[in-house]
A protein has these predicted regions:
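Sec-dependent signal peptide recognition
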Residues: 2-10
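Hinge/beta->alpha junction and helix N-cap segments in small-molecule ligand-binding domains
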Residues: 29-42, 58-67, 88-89, 112, ...
Length: 331
C-alpha cells in the first residue's frame, strides 16, 4: 500500500512539473501607464496570456528609453521566452530587439512599430486609416476654414502614419484653397499638457481664428479643450482625438469634442498574447494579414480596423464593445 502511495505521489509530481514547465514566461515592456488606454492594454494582455497558460512579467519605463533598455536586460535574465514591447522611442528600441535576439528571444512590437530593426511581429491598427477617419469626419463637419494638426510623439512611428492619413484627405481641400493648414506640430509625449500649450500657441498665432483641430490622441485633445475653454471657444472649434478615453467621450456627449477613434484594444491585446505564447512554445504563427516596412524589413503584421466614435454612435461602438460603461459615460 505504501509503495502504491509513493508511486501515486511521484505520478502527481510529474504532472505538476509538466504543467509548471508549460507556463511560459512572456515579457511585457510598457512605455508608460499615464493614460487609461495603456492600463486597459496591460489588463487585457495579462488576462489573455494567463488564459493561454502563460505568465506575464511586466516593466513600465515611465517614458525613459534608457530605463526601458535596462528593464529589457532584467527581463531577459529572468528567462522570458517572448518579449512584447510598447517602445518609448521607435528608433532606440531597435537596441532592445538586438539584445533579445542575442538571447534567442523573439520580439513583438505592440501598437508602435520599432523602426530599423529585425523585430519579428507587429500588432496594431491601421494608423493611416485612423488619420483618414479623423480628417474625413472633420471635413464633412468643417469643409472650409483654418485647420491645426497637433500630432503625437515625434519619436513614435504612429504619429507619422496618422499625419499621412490626415493629409490624404486634407490635401485636396488645401489645394483648392478651401482649407488652410495654419499650424502643425508634433508633441514629445502625447500628453495633455503639450496639447494645452500647443493649442494656446496656435490660437495666439492666429488671433483665435481656428475652425478645426485634429489631435493625435485624446490626451492631447483634452489639453486642446482646456485651451479653448480659457479663450471662450468651447463648441466653436471642432476637435477630434483618438483612443476613446472616458473623459473625452463624456466631452463628446457634451458637444465639446466632435469625435474620437476607438482602437479595438481587447482584440489587439488578445492577438498579441496569442502570438507571444505561440512563439514561446515554438508553434506556427498564423493570422498575419499584411507586412509593414520598418526600414530594415517587411514585418509580418496584424493590423486591426479602428472605429470612429461620435455622439450618435457611442452606444453602438465603445459601449457595445464593452470598453466603456453607459453609466460612466452618461453621468
Amino acid at each position: 500500500m505504501k509503495s502504491l502511495l509513493r508511486y501515486f505521489i511521484l505520478f502527481i509530481g510529474l504532472i505538476l512539473a509538466g504543467c509548471s514547465s508549460d507556463k511560459v514566461k512572456v515579457g511585457l515592456l510598457i512605455h508608460s501607464l499615464d493614460k487609461e488606454r495603456w492600463q486597459s492594454d496591460q489588463k487585457y494582455f495579462i488576462e489573455s496570456v494567463n488564459e493561454l497558460g502563460g505568465k506575464v512579467l511586466v516593466a513600465v519605463a515611465d517614458n525613459d528609453d534608457q530605463k526601458q533598455l535596462q528593464q529589457a536586460q532584467d527581463l531577459l535574465k529572468r528567462k522570458i521566452r517572448t518579449l512584447v514591447i510598447i517602445p518609448v522611442n521607435q528608433y532606440s528600441a531597435a537596441e532592445i530587439v538586438d539584445l533579445a535576439h542575442n538571447h534567442s528571444v523573439p520580439v513583438i512590437s505592440y501598437d508602435r512599430l520599432i523602426n530599423n530593426s529585425r523585430v519579428d511581429y507587429y500588432v496594431s491598427t491601421d494608423n493611416i486609416k485612423i488619420g483618414e477617419l479623423q480628417a474625413q469626419y472633420m471635413t464633412q463637419l468643417v469643409p472650409k476654414g483654418n485647420y491645426a494638426l497637433i500630432g503625437g510623439s515625434e519619436y513614435d512611428n504612429n504619429s507619422r502614419m496618422l499625419f499621412l492619413g490626415q493629409m490624404n484627405i486634407l490635401q485636396p481641400y488645401i489645394e483648392r484653397g478651401e482649407i488652410n493648414l495654419v499650424y502643425r506640430k508634433f508633441t514629445k509625449y502625447w500628453s495633455e499638457d503639450e496639447g494645452y500649450q500647443m493649442a494656446k500657441e496656435c490660437l495666439a498665432q492666429n488671433n483665435n481664428q481656428i475652425n478645426a483641430i485634429i489631435a493625435g490622441n485624446d490626451a492631447i485633445a483634452y489639453g486642446v479643450l482646456r485651451a479653448l475653454k480659457e479663450n471662450g471657444l468651447e463648441k466653436k472649434v471642432a476637435v477630434a482625438g483618438m483612443d476613446a478615453d472616458l473623459r473625452n467621450v463624456r466631452e463628446i456627449v457634451k458637444g465639446n469634442q466632435v469625435m474620437t477613434v476607438y482602437k479595438p484594444i481587447k482584440t489587439m491585446a488578445s492577438t498579441a498574447a496569442e502570438i507571444a505564447v505561440k512563439l514561446a512554445r515554438g508553434e506556427e504563427i498564423d493570422g498575419c494579414n499584411t507586412r509593414v516596412s520598418n526600414g530594415k524589413r517587411l514585418v509580418p503584421s496584424v493590423l486591426l480596423e479602428a472605429l470612429p466614435v461620435n455622439k450618435d454612435n457611442i452606444e453602438q461602438t465603445v459601449i457595445a464593445e464593452g470598453y466603456l460603461k453607459a453609466q460612466d459615460v452618461y453621468q
